[in-house]
Amino acid sequence: MTAIIEKVLSKDEVREFRAMLDKAAWPDAKAVATAGSLARLVKNNQQLDEASPLAVDLGNRILRNLGRNDQFTAYAHPQRLYPPRFNRYTDGGSYGFHSDSALLHVANSSVVIRSDMSATLFLSEPDEYDGGELEIETASEVEVVKLAAGDMILYPSGALHRVLPVTRGARVASFFWVQSMVRDAGERSLLYELDQCVQQATIAMGAGNPTVQQLAAIYHNLLRRWADT
């Protein structure tokens, strides 16, 4: 299951991010350690130096916004997040089909993140570039994603996915990984659907309604059963 989280960044924040990112140095990303050995063979893009003050500052701003985003919390149940990184595709840049590494070592630390979910936060508007669609293979179809700047998609890190060649303009994005308190993707999906039912029932019937309270209790009991902290 994938989820689109809208307006992680406002349009003003996107413009501010892009004003700084467009002036930055963008080295070839093939040697970057976040890609496994097989993924590097199909990787053809650019990536901002993850240790640069700009990458750290913008990444921290994204994390602060996500910390205030109820939909992200309800869907992901985040336990740990890999610090956001930034990439750019231009002049035919692409990334062939691959799945993300299961375990990711955070640079200059002893922290290891299990990649349960991958996130792409779009920083270019769809009309700024041709191509560059994110394709994600699910059990039943190939999902094609090209979102408005400031919007983000979450998808299972184990799913095969690729970025199609960018033939005009530049596709700029932030990407990172989430380790969830709820490891199983099916359990996360059920919890999210139940959470949405609780929210809708609360609006329709009021928080004091016995049915709403029972639904909320079921949600929290399932979360208690499935979550690791």
Feature annotation, model-predicted:
Residues D70-S174, V178-E187, L191-Y192:
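Catalytic core of non-heme Fe(II) oxygenases with the double-stranded beta-helix
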